[in-house]
Amino acid sequence: MTIVLGRVPKEENDLFDTMDDWLRRDRFVFVGWSGLLLFPCAYFALGGWFTGTTFVTSWYTHGLASSYLEGCNFLTAAVSTPANSLAHSLLLLWGPEAQGDFTRWCQLGGLWTFVALHGAFALIGFMLRQFELARSVQLRPYNAISFSGPIAVFVSVFLIYPLGQSGWFFAPSFGVAAIFRFILFFQGFHNWTLNPFHMMGVAGVLGAALLCAIHGATVENTLFEDGDGANTFRAFNPTQAEETYSMVTANRFWSQIFGVAFSNKRWLHFFMLFVPVTGLWMSAIGVVGLALNLRAYDFVSQEIRAAEDPEFETFYTKNILLNEGIRAWMAAQDQPHENLIFPEEVLPRGNAL
């Protein structure tokens, strides 16, 4: 019998393996394949927003001052949407509108589409980052799935809604006061607060806040006593087998308070995940409906009776009148190019609506 000893030739890593090794290397800030999408898009979205709020006016698109350079502050500065006449143009810097002129591109509202599209892809990249890291450390992907809620809301409000309307003009501008104005617009033109999907969204978000507060307080209240006084951060070993807090005590407490309580940690934490994510998704679905101009609840019988009987009025009919006032003032202000003229008798008159 002959035994031959020799070296097995080592195959050289191809480009993919080399990139995979570098991208997924254990470092202080994980990069990963998702980072190729996340980091550039987040950088450009934030950079575009800071640039716009610092230097760029909205005079040419909305007739407004919207930058620190013009005297706005953090609450009133914004990167505003393009003009209504530009419809759904992507407003590329090299496109037919700006023709490579950066100043003209900013004046036309090009920074808004730049921030919106890069922001959407940055959020998707962050979700993929959570998937990638979860797979690397062998976790379930619920963090990434939960983050689909904020992504759905962003995409529906900033992209799908204006796509259903006549242009990007009707999307929210990126600023605090600008978002508030958009909320008022949603109420006046869509009666958003009476939309069942908005109601489910509010229930989900506020319900999640309540659950979070209750859960945090309950865990704090039932932490097992340790030998380090009030400081529990050094007393428990991360690899300990026993519980850090008493689920049995917590269950007994809430059973006495409400009559019912969670007896299973998995169901409890899944419920805390389910409530806010479902609320955000319901809100997103509702905004998609508004993009198609679907109406909220209409209680026509109350409106007819209120019109016929001056002594009959409900909170609903009062809100409908307020919505009419919002529309009458907002439409003429926001869309001067439409030359909307309302007779004096239909315009709100101060407090005398």
Curated annotation (Swiss-Prot):
Its EC number is 1.10.3.9. GO terms for biological process: photosynthetic electron transport in photosystem II. Pheophytin a binds at Q130, N143. It is an enzyme of class 1 (oxidoreductase). GO terms for molecular function: chlorophyll binding; electron transporter, transferring electrons within the cyclic electron transport pathway of photosynthesis activity; iron ion binding; oxygen evolving activity. It is found in: Plastid, Chloroplast thylakoid membrane. Chlorophyll a PD2 binds at H198. One of its GO terms (cellular component) is photosystem II. The D1/D2 heterodimer binds P680, chlorophylls that are the primary electron donor of PSII, and subsequent electron acceptors. It shares a non-heme iron and each subunit binds pheophytin, quinone, additional chlorophylls, carotenoids and lipids. There is also a Cl(-1) ion associated with D1 and D2, which is required for oxygen evolution. The PSII complex binds additional chlorophylls, carotenoids and specific lipids. Pfam families: Photo_RC. Chlorophyll a ChlzD2 binds at H118. A plastoquinone binds at H215, F262. It is a multi-pass membrane protein. Keywords: Acetylation, Chlorophyll, Chloroplast, Chromophore, Electron transport, Iron, Magnesium, Membrane, Metal-binding, Oxidoreductase, Phosphoprotein, Photosynthesis, Photosystem II, Plastid, Thylakoid, Transmembrane, Transmembrane helix, Transport. PSII is composed of 1 copy each of membrane proteins PsbA, PsbB, PsbC, PsbD, PsbE, PsbF, PsbH, PsbI, PsbJ, PsbK, PsbL, PsbM, PsbT, PsbX, PsbY, PsbZ, Psb30/Ycf12, at least 3 peripheral proteins of the oxygen-evolving complex and a large number of cofactors. It forms dimeric complexes. Photosystem II (PSII) is a light-driven water:plastoquinone oxidoreductase that uses light energy to abstract electrons from H(2)O, generating O(2) and a proton gradient subsequently used for ATP formation. It consists of a core antenna complex that captures photons, and an electron transfer chain that converts photonic excitation into a charge separation. The D1/D2 (PsbA/PsbD) reaction center heterodimer binds P680, the primary electron donor of PSII as well as several subsequent electron acceptors. D2 is needed for assembly of a stable PSII complex. Belongs to the reaction center PufL/M/PsbA/D family. HAMAP family: PSII_PsbD_D2. This is Photosystem II D2 protein.
